[in-house]
Amino acid sequence: MATIRADEISNIIRERIEQYNREVKIVNTGTVLQVGDGIARIYGLDEVMAGELVEFEEGTIGIALNLESKNVGVVLMGDGLMIQEGSSVKATGRIAQIPVSEAYLGRVINALAKPIDGRGEISSSESRLIESPAPGIISRRSVYEPLQTGLIAIDAMIPIGRGQRELIIGDRQTGKTAVATDTILNQQGNNVICVYVAIGQKASSVAQVVNALQERGAMEYTIVVAEAADSPATLQYLAPYTGAALAEYFMYRERHTLIIYDDPSKQAQAYRQMSLLLRRPPGREAYPGDVFYLHSRLLERAAKLSSRLGEGSMTALPIVETQSGDVSAYIPTNVISITDGQIFLSADLFNAGIRPAINVGISVSRVGSAAQIKAMKQVAGKLKLELAQFAELEAFAQFSSDLDKATQNQLARGQRLRELLKQSQAKPLTVAEQILTIYTGTNGYLDSFEIAQVRKFLDELRDYVKTRKPQFEEIISSTKIFTEEAQALLKDAIQEQKELFLVQE
């Protein structure tokens, strides 16, 4: 039988006393009362803060959104299938944040900034809050630099500036996403970081966009944040804020960014679902009362920063889908009132073969010509005026059979101008190409052509100027002015190309 030695026991006790750590760990915990539909009701969590992250014992993370007298309403960032009634929950003391770094460029991630493209983890040393305050009045400066989309109809008549928020609105299948992706493609070589946020889209649609960007080398400067239609409502609600946080990271590092939200109405639907399940009182169209704030705090983060902050910018292009052209629905009117203008795409124009199907009459940019270079201002004014007169005359001409020669000429010119606004998808034009196209149309050089020949002639003219008159593009890009020298070069090119074209025909 082993002998018990008193000195050994006293040594062990002394050692334990010396090693005793007095540190008291206070954990704010609670118990799950009920779980389902992506919502959990928690008893306890007395000191939890609004928007704080909470962790369930099986690892799921949630956000405390409803703080009530007897329980806390938590939305889950996952399916929560393993959460049971009675399981414990602890408050983390943190609010939602994501890692950020240059390594995210070229990747496809989810709302929690986790990669979903199967290309491994993304390294980052910094993190950023998903929801951060928008720059104040003193931190901003007015928009003055153009953000070229490569689409004549937009760059000439509805110009977008760096730091602007321009809504793209229209029915389904009218080419809204195509306008946005063309804008991304046109940023190649312009040192603009692009973020495309897909909210509640079909996974196949997102894959199509990613493939289109990869094929044309645009993923090098693009980040895609995607939460598909089968994602939990919480993640669809968070995705735009994740995209904004990534764009802000680059903006505050003196870079220019472009962010596309496709589309915020799906985010509003996800937020409505969460709010109704949390038993918040419904308002118009069953949306909660703060749905305007949902979008305003997101879109206000787009800005052109002051010179003290490095003059970085974040340009936002939210895309909103309307139901049979109803722009006066709740979400469209909300977003229209927050943004600095809208580009309206019409199903009728799209079906008539006018693509991009931009209705120039009701589209507007509240920044206007401040976001255009001088050369574009010189030629775009005449185009706007002539198209407006043409639209008026066309409506009038439907009721009248005998029109005088001047009216017939004006209608013929208008039809050719409308033709020059047509562009194939994924074929953006440089500013110089746009200027020569508009100048050719507004100065009557297309009047002698059949409407069917206009696009072919313009394509050949652009190639001709690029190869035979490279000085034209050099003058426009260096001086940003449509000088007399550039005008003379262009006139010569048009005459020479016209002769060649007529010989071919």
UniProtKB/Swiss-Prot annotation:
Substrates-to-products reaction catalysed: ATP + H2O + 4 H(+)(in) = ADP + phosphate + 5 H(+)(out)
Function of the molecule: Produces ATP from ADP in the presence of a proton gradient across the membrane. The alpha chain is a regulatory subunit.
Gene Ontology molecular function terms on file: ADP binding; ATP binding; proton-transporting ATP synthase activity, rotational mechanism
Chief site of localization: plastid
EC id: 7.1.2.2
PANTHER family from the UniProt entry: ATP SYNTHASE SUBUNIT ALPHA, MITOCHONDRIAL
Gene name of the encoded protein: atpA
Gene Ontology CC terms: chloroplast thylakoid membrane; proton-transporting ATP synthase complex
UniProt similarity note: Belongs to the ATPase alpha/beta chains family.
Subcellular location: Plastid, Chloroplast thylakoid membrane
Membrane topology: Peripheral membrane protein
Keywords: ATP synthesis, ATP-binding, CF(1), Chloroplast, Hydrogen ion transport, Ion transport, Membrane, Nucleotide-binding, Plastid, Thylakoid, Translocase, Transport
Keyword Transferase: no
Residues annotated for ATP binding in this entry: G170, D171, R172, Q173, T174, G175, K176, T177
Organism superkingdom: Eukaryota
Enzyme class: translocase
Subunit: F-type ATPases have 2 components, CF(1) - the catalytic core - and CF(0) - the membrane proton channel. CF(1) has five subunits: alpha(3), beta(3), gamma(1), delta(1), epsilon(1). CF(0) has four main subunits: a, b, b' and c.
Site (Required for activity): S363
Pfam families listed in its UniProt record: ATP-synt_ab, ATP-synt_ab_C, ATP-synt_ab_N
Designated name of the protein: ATP synthase subunit alpha, chloroplastic
Species in which this protein is naturally found: Oenothera argillicola (Appalachian evening primrose)
